[in-house]
Structures are given as structure tokens and as C-alpha cells.
């Protein structure tokens, strides 16, 4: 009898991993190797199957959760998790993909002239940095120039147009321009990605950071130090942010209906005029990144463009849910879904959150994976290395030798106080 129960239990688990019932969660971003799952299960010996039974079978709900277990296991076997690679190794393919068109076509002086109205024009001549006098957002330019100045002695003569607005410029299908932007809608834009200025300065200004979010190195230390152990975190999904669009409304309304699952409130932004702008409630106060760390589950939404908060959330060592979106920054493609973070949408969010609340060790494992990735690969040194490789390769696409525009401002390092 015991043997029969054992065999039945193992078969039940295999069914859990391999059979996707019609009633299973309708999540349309399955792993690339989703159809090769038989290979995954064949690698499991009996002890591993037994272990998974004891850990997961008591929570198993075949109509809802079989997909999640499969995607987690598939993500664990993904060879592109950047666990042993250098930071440049993780991100090099993004640079190569962004520049493949320009390496083939070449960048002409006319390309730069066409691009100038859409960003800030920089020149590097004889290892000196020059810029047009006007910069729409000075602290954003400062955040970019910090890294350029650190690299100036390594870089050849070149010039580029860097977009410092929140939104990208180029549109797929239109004439291309070699413009660099911090984020893009990957399904719509062709902008060349660069690390956001906010790694150093010029991020959004809120009460806790009145001059703008910056110094990611210092924030990393502070956030990590403030994070309580996993088993001391509150088992609620937490969100605070302004209503940049109606896309976030459903989570706010869910929080009001089910505060045991979600604590989500809107804060005030510059566009706020009345409580109508925060769905009938007074705006919540803004909070620090460190405060987020009290909670086991954090959720990220894109704003006007990609979210500045995203990379900070991982540092809490909490499980990060990311709303499905085609908006990316340079490091997003290196994050593996269901290994570093969990992709969600409005229709599957409650099911996925409930799954992880009842499978705590899986939640803790993914939270740890995401934290380790950000802590290892998003250092200021890694950002500087990305800039270096990007500009060195970009310079190879230039089909002419830039000439200094004499009216431009020479940018020099700021004196340390």
C-alpha cells in the first residue's frame, strides 16, 4: 500500500510539471524552451521528485499552479542567468544588438546633424569632453558626464547625441537616427540604450530625495542594510507611486478590497489637482526605498517610460513582481523571468501572489536570485564598463573624424568638497 501511494504521488508531481490543463493560468510569456520540458523532468532522479513532492504537493492546485512550477524549473535550468559571467558578459549582447544596424551602415555627419534637435550633443576630442551649452535637465547631464569623464582618457575622438528626456525618440519603420536613450519600448523604438543618469544623479525628486534620486552605490548600501530577514517581512504585496496612467488603478482598487493581500496607494505628483486624481482618496505620503523592505512582495509598474524604481526594489531582498511591459532599460533583458523576478498581469496577479504566499521557500529563492544579480551586476563599476564598451564600439561605426565645435562648453570634473 505504501509503495502504491509513493508511485501515485510521484506520478501526480510529474503530471503537475508536464500537463497544462485548459484551466491553467493564461500567461502568455512562457519560457523559450517551454516545449522541451520532458528533458527537464528526465534529469530529476527519484530523490529530487520526492523532495519536490514534500515541498509543493500539499499546495498543488492543478487548474492554477502547474504552469508556475514548470516555469520556475525551466528558469532554473536556463543557461543565461549570468551567475558566472562578468557584468560585461551579461550585457554585451545588448550593446551588440543596439549597434548592429549602425555597424553595418555606418554613422555619418548627416546622421548626427539630423539627431541634434532630439538630444544633447556631446563631443570627445583629444580626450576632452565638450557639450552644447544648453541642457534641458542639468542634473541628468551631470549624471551622464560623471561616467564620460571617468572614461575620457580611454576614448577616441567621437560625437554622439544623448536624449535626456524620459521618453525615447526613434520609431521603428521610420528613418533611423543614432540617438541614445535610457529606455525604450522595445516593440516600437530603435533608440540605442545607455545606463540612466540616475545611477549618479538626476533621478526623480521626491520628499526623501529632494535633489533627485542618485548615487546608486550609496543607496545600495543603505537599502541592503535596512532590509529585515525574510521571515520578518510582512506577507503583503506593497506599492506606492503616483498615478502616471490608469494602468495602475486595478492594484489600488484591489488593495481597498483585499488589504490582506495588497497595500497599494497613490502618492501625489505634479499633475495632482484633487482626490479624483487618486481615485477618491487623499494621496499617501511618499516613502523611502528602505521602507519597502518591510514587505515580502513588491510590484513594479512602468511609468511614463521604464521605471526608475525597478532596480532599487531588488535590493530589499523581497520578491519582485514586474507588470508585463515591452519597456526596457539596458539591463532588463539579462533578468530571467521566474528566476530573478516574476512577471504578472492584472488577470493572473492574485493567483500568482497566492501561489507564492503558500510556497514561501520558492518566493525566498527567487527574491535572493534577483538581489544577487542587481548587487553583482549593477555596480557603478559595471555601469562605467557598459559605457566604455558602448562608446568604443559606437566609435567604430563613425565614418568621419569629428571636428570640435568651438562654441561648445568644455566639461571638467567637479571639484570634491
Residue ranges and their predicted role:
Residues 11, 18-20, 157, 232, ...:
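Generic structural microfeature
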Residues 23-288:
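Secretory-pathway glycan-assembly enzymes, especially type II membrane glycosyltransferases
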Amino acid at each position: 500500500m505504501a509503495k502504491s501511494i509513493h508511485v501515485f504521488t510521484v506520478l501526480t508531481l510529474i503530471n503537475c510539471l508536464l500537463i497544462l490543463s485548459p484551466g491553467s493560468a493564461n500567461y502568455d510569456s512562457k519560457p523559450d524552451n517551454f516545449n522541451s520540458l520532458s528533458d527537464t523532468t528526465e534529469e530529476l532522479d527519484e530523490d529530487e521528485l520526492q523532495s519536490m513532492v514534500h515541498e509543493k504537493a500539499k499546495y498543488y492546485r492543478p487548474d492554477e499552479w502547474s504552469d508556475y512550477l514548470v516555469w520556475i524549473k525551466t528558469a532554473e535550468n536556463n543557461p543565461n542567468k549570468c551567475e558566472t559571467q562578468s557584468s560585461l558578459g551579461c550585457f554585451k549582447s545588448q550593446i551588440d544588438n543596439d549597434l548592429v544596424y549602425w555597424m553595418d551602415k555606418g554613422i555619418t555627419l548627416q546622421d548626427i546633424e539630423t539627431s541634434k534637435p532630439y538630444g544633447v550633443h556631446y563631443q570627445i576630442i583629444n580626450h576632452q569632453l565638450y557639450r552644447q551649452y544648453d541642457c534641458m535637465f542639468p542634473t541628468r547631464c551631470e549624471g551622464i558626464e560623471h561616467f564620460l569623464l571617468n572614461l575620457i582618457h580611454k576614448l577616441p575622438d567621437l560625437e554622439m547625441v544623448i536624449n535626456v528626456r524620459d521618453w525615447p525618440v526613434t520609431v521603428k519603420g521610420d528613418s533611423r537616427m543614432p540617438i541614445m536613450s535610457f529606455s525604450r519600448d522595445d516593440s516600437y523604438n530603435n533608440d540605442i540604450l545607455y545606463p540612466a543618469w540616475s545611477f549618479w544623479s538626476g533621478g526623480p525628486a521626491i520628499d526623501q530625495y529632494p535633489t533627485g534620486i542618485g548615487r546608486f552605490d550609496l543607496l545600495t548600501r543603505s537599502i541592503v542594510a535596512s532590509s529585515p530577514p525574510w521571515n520578518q517581512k510582512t506577507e503583503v504585496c506593497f506599492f506606492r507611486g503616483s498615478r502616471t496612467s490608469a494602468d495602475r488603478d486595478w492594484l489600488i482598487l484591489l488593495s481597498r478590497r483585499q488589504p490582506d493581500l495588497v497595500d497599494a496607494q497613490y502618492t501625489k505628483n505634479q499633475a495632482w489637482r484633487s482626490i479624483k486624481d487618486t481615485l477618491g482618496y487623499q494621496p499617501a505620503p511618499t516613502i523611502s526605498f528602505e521602507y519597502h523592505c518591510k514587505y515580502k512582495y513588491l510590484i513594479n509598474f512602468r511609468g511614463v517610460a521604464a521605471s526608475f524604481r525597478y532596480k532599487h526594489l531588488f535590493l530589499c531582498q523581497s520578491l519582485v513582481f514586474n507588470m508585463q511591459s515591452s519597456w526596457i532599460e539596458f539591463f532588463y533583458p539579462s533578468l530571467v523571468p521566474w528566476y530573478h523576478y516574476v512577471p504578472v498581469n492584472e488577470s493572473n496577479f492574485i493567483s500568482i501572489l497566492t501561489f507564492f504566499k503558500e510556497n514561501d521557500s520558492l518566493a525566498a529563492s527567487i527574491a535572493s536570485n534577483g538581489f544577487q544579480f542587481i548587487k553583482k551586476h549593477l555596480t557603478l563599476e559595471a555601469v562605467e564598463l557598459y559605457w566604455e564598451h558602448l562608446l568604443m564600439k559606437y566609435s567604430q561605426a563613425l565614418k568621419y573624424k569629428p571636428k570640435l565645435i568651438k562654441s561648445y562648453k568644455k566639461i571638467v570634473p567637479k571639484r570634491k568638497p
